[in-house]
Amino acid sequence: MALPTWAERLGYHEIQTDATGQLVSWAAPDPGQAYGRVIAAVWDFWKHMGTCANGVPYFFQHQVWKPEHDGRGLGGDQLAMALSSLNLLYGYSGDPEARAMMVRIADYYLDHGFSRPTDAWPNLPFPYNTDVHSGICDGDMRAGKGFLQPDKAGAFGIELLTLYEMTGSPRYLTAAVGIANTLAAKVTPGDGEHSPWPFRVQAQTGELATRAYAPYTANWTGTLRLFDELIRLKQGKPAACHSAHALLSAWLRAYPMKNDKWGPFFEDVAEWSNTEINADTLAWYLLEHPQWDAGWRQNARAILDWTLGTFGTNGWARYGVTPIQEQTVYRVPGNSHTSRHASVEMLYAEKTGDCAHKAEAIRQLNWATYMVDDDGKNRYPNDDIWLTDGYGDYLRHYLRAMAAAPELAPTGQDHLLRSSSVIQQIEYGKEAIRYRTFDAASRERLRVAFEPASITAGGRRLRKYERMEDLDRREGYFFAASGSASGLLEIKHARSGTIVISQEPGR
């Protein structure tokens, strides 16, 4: 690892390069060690942010961290993003504090932030606390008190459903169903100027906002996933979810996927603005749900190329990296947006075998580590320490990148990287890794520091296979003892979600 001759700084650190002048992370030249260090630092800072004077955790009430306490309230999708990252972090680390924080966030929001059952738009979360330290979410940052954002409701709904599958608490299922029922009842076909649900709407009256842009947003990946999972679980009103899902899918194919109107998203922007996040999250959905669109590969590639062409910036081209800007009204490359785009590129490479963008995606992940200080402060470049961009909408991109490319996970450590079912409980012990999935049938990916002596599902020993492809047809596991992703462990089970991965005795 080398410093440029002029020791240029990026974020909190002096830029580091490899022997060819390409950007590597400040934290370590090896991506896995670097990302592991950054994840640990960010999480440590996050869980020690402290509380406000009213006793509520700082993270639950503010969108920006400052030692003197920032005057603004929540970010629009801040709590849903947090649940998303914490779910992945719990599987990766086994830290019970991550799981406990998920419960605290969900319970707080359900107790202090939803529209009334009698409202025109009932049982949906408000995205903002207009009186910051009131302990209540009751409106929209720009439209004002009483307004909510249906797209953020869908995103929070799928995270509630994940938490239900993790904990078994019916409260989270009931709330997720309530969100889905309202969205299914309010869906419209939409058109080029109106999405199937508005971006900002008055909860009590159903009127659209006039103080801020209201009729359209393309941020519906969370809502698609909410409907998908309720249909799979046969919970709530599956038929209504199916109909709403079909209308939403038709609209996405007819409009954003054709005209590239991928805005807006952000709570603090009152006007129209095209965004990276809405586009790239739909590309992620396409790659994870190829059955949704026959042209999934071409359309995912088109979205990723659009993002790069629209929001890529060449200020760091000499280091082989193109950071990604946030949106058209704020053309500043960001830690969350660059790492998200990179993680979707990594998934694209995994799903298609086309690795043309993979090396630069790793450099994009490297670039975004520079915004993290040694103590875990994570600052948007030339801006504030945003609790969306630096925390909930940051960690998940590194964890997803590791899942798509296990060689990016730390070597010599044990980490679960991905599961097709929700991880209810996981323990990384000295003699074994033990975990339990919500579904009896699931597939997991780990990177571990040992070759398993045995793996059981519900006490029944799983067979080892020499090729990962064998798991496409049967239960068992595959372990890579060597190669760039040495320690890769892939497990498939069909009859029990209780898994024990045992080490050799005495190790």
Model regions: which residues?
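Structural helix-adjacent loops and short alpha-helical linkers that scaffold large soluble proteins
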Residues: 16, 20-40, 89-103, 163-177, ...
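Well-ordered alpha-helical segments within folded domains of soluble proteins
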Residues: 13-23, 71-91, 141, 145-165, ...
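Low-complexity, Ser/Thr/Pro/Gly-enriched N-terminal "stalk/linker" regions
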Residues: 4-78, 96-142, 178, 182, ...
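Extended glycan-interaction surfaces of carbohydrate-active proteins
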Residues: 53-68, 152, 219-272, 278-279, ...
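Positions within ordered alpha-helical repeat solenoids
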Residues: 48, 88, 108-111, 115, ...
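Catalytic cores of secreted or luminal carbohydrate-active enzymes
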Residues: 364-371, 376, 381-425
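Solenoidal tandem-repeat scaffolds enriched in leucines and small polar residues
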Residues: 161, 169-257
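C-terminal beta-sandwich/jelly-roll accessory domains of carbohydrate-active enzymes
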Residues: 407-507
